């Protein structure tokens, strides 16, 4: 018998209805065409396992990771969906790390496996955050809102100590600023890699004013000096000439 509307199964198999090309494999029904296509009434559920129930995922075979985002709770059966379910829309309106779907995602039952990395669900009213947001240890509620960190996230009330997000790519750090940070990013004591290396520079540090390691900018103006330069305690102006301090002066 001819195909009803190739590619699809034989009319006797699919009840005169053309199948979708992304549906069931033909291995379980010998009368189907070679193209992977069959209605659920033709093919047994084991055709494309693991997957969701055909009525949940629009009669198409589901991905091996589980259900489609449009699946409902009845879709995520333990036999067809593996944890986590319906990723990567964990924090949307679909599944959340378990075998059941729901409108609220990051419930306490999901824990840290819900949509890591993100804030703990008990910290942000079941709202998950992006990877560049808060640390899992929780911050102040005013730090993180919606799906991104506010500029205050890396301030004094959250993820201390760190620089302003505009300097450090919104990542809280235990050390200090990135080389691209400006002076206002660093509070005393704070290190400027381009200024003082592993030493902490003063709050008035200007990364364009001197090199590693160097004298204080108030001692030697804005001239870069060599490693055999002046001591941080300052020296008289004759010590700093050309591009290097005289050891005898310091």
Curated annotation (Swiss-Prot):
Keywords: Keratin, Repeat. The keyword Transferase does not apply. It comes from the Eukaryota. Signal peptide: none annotated. It holds the Pfam family Keratin_B2_2. Residues 8-248 are annotated as: 32 X 5 AA repeats of C-C-[CGSVRQH]-[SQTNP]-[PTSI]. InterPro entries: KAP. Sequence repeats lie at residues 8-12, 13-17, 18-22, 37-41, 42-46, 51-55, 56-60, 61-65, 66-70, 75-79, 80-84, 85-89, 90-94, 95-99, 105-109, 114-117, 118-121, 133-137, 138-142, 143-147, 153-157, 162-166, 167-171, 176-180, 185-189, 190-194, 214-218, 219-223, 229-233, 234-238, 239-243, 244-248. GO terms for cellular component: cytosol; keratin filament. In the hair cortex, hair keratin intermediate filaments are embedded in an interfilamentous matrix, consisting of hair keratin-associated proteins (KRTAP), which are essential for the formation of a rigid and resistant hair shaft through their extensive disulfide bond cross-linking with abundant cysteine residues of hair keratins. The matrix proteins include the high-sulfur and high-glycine-tyrosine keratins. Belongs to the KRTAP type 9 family. Interacts with hair keratins. PANTHER family: DOMAIN TRANSCRIPTION FACTOR AP2-O3, PUTATIVE-RELATED, KERATIN ASSOCIATED PROTEIN. This is Keratin-associated protein 9-1. It comes from Homo sapiens.
